[in-house]
Curated annotation (Swiss-Prot):
Binding residues for ATP: 16, 173-175, 240-241, 249, 255-256, 272, 276
Residues noted as binding L-methionine in the record, renumbered to the chain: 57, 99, 249, 280
Protein residues bound to K(+): 44
Annotated region described as Flexible loop, given as residue ranges: 99-109
Organism of derivation: Lacticaseibacillus paracasei (strain ATCC 334 / BCRC 17002 / CCUG 31169 / CIP 107868 / KCTC 3260 / NRRL B-441) (Lactobacillus paracasei)
EC main group: transferase
Name by which UniProt lists this protein: S-adenosylmethionine synthase
Amino acid sequence: MQERHLFTSESVSEGHPDKIADQISDAILDAMLEQDPDSRVACETTVTTGLVLVVGEISTKAYVDIQSVVRGTIKKIGYTKESGFDPDSVGVLVALDEQSPDIAQGVDESLEARESDTDPLDKIGAGDQGMMFGFAIDETENYMPLPISLAHALMRKTDSLRHKGEISYLRPDAKAQVTVEYDDDDNPIRVDSVVVSVQHDPDVTLEEIRRDVEAKIIRTVIPEALMDDDTKIYVNPTGRFVLGGPQADSGLTGRKIIVDTYGGFARHGGGAFSGKDATKVDRSASYAARYIAKNVVAAGLAKRVEVQLAYAIGVAKPVSVSVNTFGTSAVSEDVIEQAIRENFDLRPAGIIKMLDLKRPIYEQTAAYGHFGRTDVDLPWEHLDKVQALLKYRD
């Protein structure tokens, strides 16, 4: 048991420079998967004042007009000449090469396949070595930590009001941060502080911004029961946020990996998601680990669980599967590991088949987090393994 403590997580809007880059990378990935589901894509994007640079390694039968995808993505986010990033005039440089044949030979034909294994799901090897984590907790309905859930909700609301024109002076760049107080049983009891910074037109007053953001965003998103007289609210604490987006800060694919996952509440293996096809276990195995963790908690095997998977490049089977329930499990962790091995195929081809990952579903994950989403249908958020896991409680 620990004393009362605080935990903080942040989120950013779809117009944050790093998220622009993530969305462009995933929009390119989706465009390729739409034409060729077997596309191999590792696409990185950099955005800065007046410039988008797209680099990476791609092997595909698809033809994609990269310039058009880039400009369309920027326009959809809502950037204009006035807000500092004009989709029509921004320079777009593309430097894409083919996937390395040395990597391709290990992905196309795994170590197991080279050793005469005939199982078709053993054919694809992991695209890289590394470890990936998945997490779930029962403190929210979407099995996510409360701080990151609230931070994402604030950003979704901010972007929604901007797109609808309900707060007319908002521009696309924004950030939110939420600090939650936990009691000595580790249950969330209140919101201690909220920080929201929104980019805005130059002719609006700070007082109007603070009034609107608190009333129309913060107070509508955060449950009243979690707010009290001691909750601290900070709206645009610098006093001015006119210059934003790539005009103020350069952005890069994969630089918001904690926002993308659990807000720091769980560990992270270090690999980013956006711009990568599902043979890259950085992405697909992280999705599988979340899928496992969410179903384990939903089945009542634990109140919180962190699942670690690890891979060797060119090898299909994971080199390790590890479970940590933080003392909250209803059964032993060995039983949970057994349940995982018996119910989840964790070879790359098995994950791709299990979660149907050759589809163009990725751009929608590139803002507001990849996990705990209720606004879009993501296969790794499904609870279709709960029934199979219930038998392990006996």
